[in-house]
């Protein structure tokens, strides 16, 4: 997978978030939630106009360029918020976390800001750079799509269902377009042609003739997917208040964060159970039986989603903003960390396997009628 150069123009534009946020933080009129929402919408609108004016050719070639440019700006804002909440910087975004979206001050909110300000930011620059040079960015787009969708679905649902539901301000409604963007962007990314592979028909036939036992790496991934599926189901039952002793011990001694009334961990586990659990079963099937050409794409999507989710979940479980009673106990910290780290790494190994050795997932080549006729006679 080729890594496209980063978009310098968008990088420079996104860094304007630093002086803008600092200046707005000292405007006394922004102490009212409605003014915060209106000013935020105005800034994003002006930013979109600026991007369209400065990069009309790129936007005409691929409208997602404008989306990536605006989101790169918001990623820098999110990184500022995370650094501010952890007391690394001061005087930038206090007005927004107080009057705009106070739930960003939770441990979960801090870590999704860290992820958005680092991983998503680099993805935006890479994808925008690819558009500038008329190159493909399909694989980066699929990973971003999964990560972005998981982040926004868990965060918005947790805001509505958790203890911060009474703290929803007008700025919350600015996130509604964030629900629509993944749908549109997903269709655009999936419609892009796949990168060409060097798999010949003979290579595909040879690879697809091998059984699962002849492919030890795939066998290991299937075993992982089965174990991950059981772990996903178990944690889903835990947050659904399953009365068994195993669930009781786990939620109190291993992951008490699942009881946190902010609701983000509960929503996250249910997302895993309803979406990741079926994917584990389907992926295990695709690694066993050849010709499942859908797996490489969806492996990237789920790798992005699970990577983002596990980063936020693990970080929030140990962060000081999480009440002490809901943090991971010291005596079970090692078990918690290893299990959750493996849960995050597995989908990335699956995606890497699918991208590097895709022959097994290609559609079987059509049989040669002439060769078949000679064989029969």
Swiss-Prot record:
Effect of residue 167 to K: Associated with higher circulating levels of alanine transaminase with lower levels of low-density lipoprotein-cholesterol (LDL-C), triglycerides and alkaline phosphatase in 3 independent populations; reduces protein expression by 46%
Name recorded for this polypeptide: Transmembrane 6 superfamily member 2
PANTHER family: TRANSMEMBRANE 6 SUPERFAMILY MEMBER 2, TRANSMEMBRANE SUPERFAMILY 6 MEMBER 1/2
Tissue expression profile of the protein: Substantial expression in liver and intestine, whereas all other tissues analyzed show low levels.
Source organism: Homo sapiens (Human)
Gene: TM6SF2
Similarity comment: family membership: Belongs to the TM6SF family.
Location in the cell: Endoplasmic reticulum membrane; Endoplasmic reticulum-Golgi intermediate compartment membrane
BP GO annotations: lipid homeostasis; lipid metabolic process; regulation of lipid metabolic process
Task of the protein: Regulator of liver fat metabolism influencing triglyceride secretion and hepatic lipid droplet content. May function as sterol isomerase.
Membrane-protein topology: Multi-pass membrane protein
GO cellular component: endoplasmic reticulum membrane; endoplasmic reticulum-Golgi intermediate compartment membrane
């Amino acid at each position: 997978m080729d890594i496209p150069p980063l978009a310098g123009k968008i990088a420079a534009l996104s860094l304007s978030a630093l002086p803008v946020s600092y200046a707005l933080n000292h405007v006394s009129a922004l102490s009212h939630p409605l003014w915060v929402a209106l000013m935020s919408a105005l800034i994003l609108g002006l930013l979109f106009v600026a991007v369209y004016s400065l990069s009309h050719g790129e936007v005409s070639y691929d409208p997602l360029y404008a989306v990536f440019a605006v989101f790169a700006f918001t990623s820098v804002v999110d990184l500022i918020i995370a650094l501010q909440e952890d007391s690394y910087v001061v005087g930038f975004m206090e007005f927004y976390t107080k009057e705009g979206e106070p739930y960003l001050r939770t441990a979960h909110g801090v870590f999704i800001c860290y992820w958005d300000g680092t991983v998503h930011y680099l993805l935006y620059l890479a994808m925008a750079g690819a558009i500038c040079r008329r190159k493909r960015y399909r694989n980066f787009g699929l990973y971003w799509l999964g990560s972005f969708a998981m982040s926004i679905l868990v965060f918005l649902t947790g805001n509505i269902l958790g203890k911060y539901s009474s703290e929803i301000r007008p700025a919350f409604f600015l996130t509604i377009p964030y629900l629509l963007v993944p749908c549109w962007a997903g269709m655009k990314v999936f419609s892009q042609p796949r990168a060409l592979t060097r798999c010949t028909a003979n290579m595909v036939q040879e690879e697809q003739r091998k059984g699962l036992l002849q492919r030890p790496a795939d066998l290991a991934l299937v075993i992982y997917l089965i174990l991950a599926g059981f772990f996903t189901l178990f944690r889903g039952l835990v947050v659904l208040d399953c009365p068994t002793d195993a669930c009781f011990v786990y939620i109190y001694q291993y992951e008490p964060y699942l009881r946190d009334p902010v609701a983000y961990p509960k929503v996250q586990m249910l997302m895993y159970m309803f979406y990741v659990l079926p994917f584990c079963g389907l992926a295990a099937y695709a690694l066993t039986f050849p010709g499942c050409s859908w797996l490489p794409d969806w492996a990237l999507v789920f790798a992005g989603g699970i990577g983002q989710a596990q980063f936020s979940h693990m970080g929030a479980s140990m962060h000081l903003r999480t009440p002490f009673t809901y943090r991971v106990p010291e005596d079970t910290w090692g078990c918690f960390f290893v299990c959750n780290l493996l849960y995050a790494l597995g989908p990335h190994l699956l995606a890497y396997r699918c991208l590097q050795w895709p022959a097994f997932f290609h559609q079987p080549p059509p049989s040669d009628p002439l060769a078949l006729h000679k064989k029969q006679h």
